[in-house]
Amino acid sequence: MIRVGLLGGSFNPAHGGHRRISLFAREALGLDEVWWLVSPGNPLKPKAGMAPLAARLASARKTARRAPIRVTAIERELGTKYTIDTLRGLTRRYPKCRFVWLMGSDNLAQFHRWKEWRNIARAMPIAVIARPGYDGAAIASPAMAWLARYRRSAASLIIRKTGSNRAEWSAPALIQLRFDPDPRSATQLRRADPDWALGFAGPAPRDGLTHRSIRPNPA
């Protein structure tokens, strides 16, 4: 079984902070690799200021270069809009992978607004990575009130071998990861360079999972 961490987001644009938390989580949780799920559109984020998917995927591929990170826009192919539907599609398509959902504490603070958020937690372990300025809201969130009973240490997220040599992680499980805060954010980068996407206007990037080209402004 391949152990995979899933980090979803707009990546508008991707930056070193994404890479750093991914590599940290990979080491802390004993993952084989991390997949960045570049969202075609986040239902909880405004469309204004959102760069084209092809540009965001290209920026993510550049940021993830030479790291055990796969960059994908597979949600577009799956036709999914919400995380729970994406996760169901991934588990069906990749039965030899065992997934853990990675997210920052800013997302935990609003996790209760996500579609079927409890079923997301039941589908796979969730690892929450501290993010400056959001820990208080995350701790006080409705989702944390429910997830707290499932809190586990990173060391407990281990592979259990069964007679069929399959690896299974139990869920729900909440793992809280702490490391030196990374102050970088996509919002700051957009403010500093509103036209950053123009730097990724070259050939259509290839999806790291499907290996198909991601064309600008797909129909």
What are these model-derived regions, one by one?
Residues 1-219:
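Nucleotidyltransferase catalytic core that binds NTPs
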